[in-house]
């Protein structure tokens, strides 16, 4: 299955880099401490095709956006639409300049926890 990249700063001709960014384990953004500053080195926003079982016993295929990024030797990942939207706004502003993000989040009006990010302007 081909990977459909939406946005990335990796060399998409490098198969090892593609594997590193799209396969294997990554730390979940949701588990990071709020207020933590994370320097971003490489990132990849891509579309992943998944299957899920339905109640009638059949399966259906769906697509979801996945964001992964690296900081040092660690890879982080999320499917949070809120986080992805904020992260991509930062990427657009920063273009090719180095940057770090600060992990933020809170609780929505309906009581669900969410994770987000903002640009670390002190980086």
In which residue ranges do the predicted regions lie?
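GIY-YIG-like beta-to-alpha core
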Residues: 76-87
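Glycine-centered tight beta-turn/hairpin loop motif at sheet-sheet or coil-to-beta transitions
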Residues: 70-74
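Short nucleic-acid-contacting surface segments enriched for D/E, G, S/T with interspersed K/R
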Residues: 31-33, 85-104
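OB-fold ssDNA-binding interfaces and closely related basic DNA-contact patches used
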Residues: 1-69, 110, 116-123
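Flexible glycine-rich surface loops and low-complexity tracts that mediate binding to linear polymers
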Residues: 42, 94-117
């Amino acid at each position: 299955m081909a990977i459909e990249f939406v946005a990335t700063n990796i060399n998409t001709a490098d198969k090892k880099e593609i594997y590193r960014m799209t396969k294997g384990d990554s730390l979940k953004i949701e588990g990071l401490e709020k207020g933590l500053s994370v320097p971003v080195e490489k990132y990849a926003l891509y579309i992943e095709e998944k299957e899920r079982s339905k109640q009638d016993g059949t399966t259906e295929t769906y697509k979801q956006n996945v964001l992964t990024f690296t900081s040092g030797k660690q890879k982080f990942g999320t499917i949070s639409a809120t986080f992805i939207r904020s992260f991509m706004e930062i990427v657009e502003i920063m273009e090719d300049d180095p940057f770090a993000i600060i992990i933020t989040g809170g609780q929505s009006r309906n009581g669900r926890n969410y994770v987000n990010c903002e640009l670390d302007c002190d980086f």
